[in-house]
Amino acid sequence: MTAQLIDGNALAKTIRAEVAGRTAALKAKGVEPALSIILVGSDPASQVYTKHKVNDSTETGLAATLETYPADMSEAALLDRIRALNDDPKVHGILVQLPLPRHMDSQKVIETISPAKDVDGFHVASAGALMTGAPGFWPCTPYGCMKMLESIGYDLRGKHAVVIGRSNIVGKPMAMMLLARSATVTICHSATQDLAAFTRQADVIVAAVGKRNILTAGMVKPGAVVIDVGMNRKEDGKLAGDVDFDGVKEVAGWITPVPGGVGPMTRAMLLVNTLEAAERAAK
């Protein structure tokens, strides 16, 4: 068996086209969806990520601005800037690129963003909404994973899903989203004993720990769906996920590649969240 590929690039392209159409409709009503991105410091990876986010936005008709500040910017100044954006009716989404400089409290910064503009889905109010099923913004990476499962017509009801990783950004919200679709969910992490004992029982596996080859072919049930959230650098500098792709693809039924899998979907769902923030504000 060779697994079928879930092409994140192709799916993200479809979603961007949908966003462009809805954005045009909103503009026709006099509302221009707008995203403000804040970058503090000069981390090379963050510079690349924010550039992609601006380009994605403008390509779909969303207005996007990137504000860059030096790494020695005070936390108080950053919070003041966020509050000003909260009060600006022309701004619908606010994204502070992580990681922040060490002298800043990331959670405090995130909590300063208005929940109505928290398009990253990291605010505690967004987490609470996800937990209870109330309206809110889902974190972009697990949201993208769910869209990938939807794209292959996968029915999660009654299926056993194993999430490897327990971060607030991916692991925990991923588990909640799967649970909301009536999957039976197991969360594994660094203290889990005998990881393979859990993954071999799984119909769906989401690997999200940032560790190469944490999931190998012998740990996967034949026909399982494998979603690889990992983003790691190999010795030659090329990107690799958390999954041993070459081995696992011979066992799994469906698998996402790295690159070209979850990454493009994360960016696409940011556009969806920003558009929905604008649509809600326009009501």
Curated annotation (Swiss-Prot):
The protein's annotated pathway: One-carbon metabolism; tetrahydrofolate interconversion
Gene Ontology cellular component list: cytosol
Catalyzed reactions: (6R)-5,10-methylene-5,6,7,8-tetrahydrofolate + NADP(+) = (6R)-5,10-methenyltetrahydrofolate + NADPH; (6R)-5,10-methenyltetrahydrofolate + H2O = (6R)-10-formyltetrahydrofolate + H(+)
Molecular function GO labels: methenyltetrahydrofolate cyclohydrolase activity; methylenetetrahydrofolate dehydrogenase (NADP+) activity
Binding-site residues, NADP(+): 165-167, 190
InterPro entries noted in UniProt: Aminoacid_DH-like_N_sf, NAD(P)-bd_dom_sf, THF_DH/CycHdrlase, THF_DH/CycHdrlase_cat_dom, THF_DH/CycHdrlase_NAD-bd_dom
Name of the featured protein: Bifunctional protein FolD
Protein's organism: Variovorax paradoxus (strain S110)
Protein encoded by which gene: folD
